[in-house]
C-alpha cells in the first residue's frame, strides 16, 4: 500500500471574454484557515507547510505566494514569508516573520498588483501568555517587488498543504473556508 501525505488545490480560471481575466493583470485571494493544531504550530512536524499562491501557472507551478511553515525552532508558532515558484521550486523573496496567528480563524490575504506582491495573515484568537512573552507577531504583513513581466499572464491559484493527517486521521489537518479570488 502506498501512503501519501499533503494535498494540492489548483485552480485555473476560464479565460473567455465574458470572464475578463485576459485583460486583468492583478489578482488577490482571501481565505480563512482553521488548523487542527491549536497551540499555533500549525502542522505535525517541522518542515511541513501551507503555500497560498497566486499568479500561478498551474501546470509548471511558476508563480508567487505566501509560505506558512512549521520550523524546529518553535512548538507554538510558525514562520511566514513570501515565495516565488520557478519550475516547482520555491525560493524566499521576503523577510521571515515568526507568528502565532496560524490558529482557528486565521485569515490569509495574498495580492499581486502592478509588480508588487503583498500578504497579510491575522486572527482574532488571543495568544497564550507564553506566546506573548516570547514576542511572536500577532499578525503578518509582507511585501516584495516581483516585477511586472514575469508571470504576468498567469491567473491560477495554488494551495499546497504538505502536512500529514496525524492521529485519528485529522489532528494535523487544516480546514479551509470561503476561498475568494478577485481579478482586477
Where are these regions (language model features)?
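Beta-strand elements of well-folded, non-transmembrane domains
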Residues: 33-37, 58, 86, 112-114, ...
